[in-house]
Amino acid sequence: MADSKRVLVAGATGYLGKFAVKAFKEHGYQVRVLTRDEKRLYEPGPFTAPAISEDDVDDVFVGEISKPETLGGLMDGVDLVFSSVGISRQRDGLTFEQVDYQCNKNLINLCQPSGVKRFVYVSMQGAENIMQLAITKAHEKVVALLKDSGMEYRIVRPCGYFSDMGVLLDMAKKGRAFMIGDGNNKMSPIHGRDLAEVCIETAEGDEIEVEAGGPDIMTQREAAKLAFEVVGKPVKITVIPMWAARGMVKFIGLLSTQFGDLAEFIVTAGEIDGVGPARGKTSLRNYLEALHAGDPNP
């Protein structure tokens, strides 16, 4: 599919987006990226995401995804749109509805009259079990839009990201990890580099929705113990009871709807399983060991 195909990558300054830009280029695509701040493209991204080089992109479109009036011509010549746009950490007081839903809706609206052949969207695994969450509602509203759009579409559903595991290593280095709930829920997070490859396979394949996990299935408690093992310190875990965490969520929600929604997602993730097909190859141990050793590209 890559022969003379142009892909637009939206979310290119985020964790997965940076890996996706590099992967699409390596697979022979012409890569256009959408960003509101071109300088950020060439800086290392959040949570060990790599810096993008000028060789990784063919053209940069500077615009504000939340402002369609700045996006004229964005889809010109584009065959495939890849979007990992969404809130990874709460900033600017924006809601999941405003970012995860509305910004992707803006992209979809631009695609329909422009001849874009396919749209690849990164949602989340297990969404059907947590539809009460604002983040899940926003993601699945985008999925519904794509289903009704008339375009070909593909949905990638990761089972969590290695980027979220770095906090375990940080806590282990400090000598104590804090855990919401008993930590016995199972997960199979995936490295961003591996997930980017899954996204390209999905973009080029026939499977409509793809779940993607890493090679390891473990509990949150086991992952925390692994982090302590990697840093060579005794395991010390403090459990925050679920009732206390839920109380904190309600309090935070009274102060800020935006932060309350994010807190509710974090707490809920501490009590449900997130396991899917093992499509990634990088083990969590290898990632944490490389991260601990100071490898800039773990």
Task: State what each model feature region is.
Residues K5-Y29, T35:
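N-terminal Rossmann NAD(P)H-binding glycine-rich loop of SDR-like oxidoreductase domains
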Residues K39-E43, T48-N106, L110-P113, E128:
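NAD(P)H-binding glycine-rich loop region in Rossmannoid oxidoreductase-like domains
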Residues I87-K173:
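Glycine-/Pro-rich loop/turn segments that contact NAD(P) or position catalytic residues
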Residues C103, G181-T202, I208:
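Substrate-positioning beta->alpha
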Residues S163-D170, E201-V210, K233-V235:
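Glycine/proline-rich active-site loop of Rossmann-fold NAD(P)-dependent oxidoreductases
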Residues I180-N185, V210-I217, F228-G232, I240, ...:
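Glycine-rich Rossmann NAD(P)(H)-binding loop
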Residues E222-E271:
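Terminal hydrophobic/aromatic helix or amphipathic segment near a protein terminus
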Residues A269-P298:
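Amphipathic terminal alpha-helices
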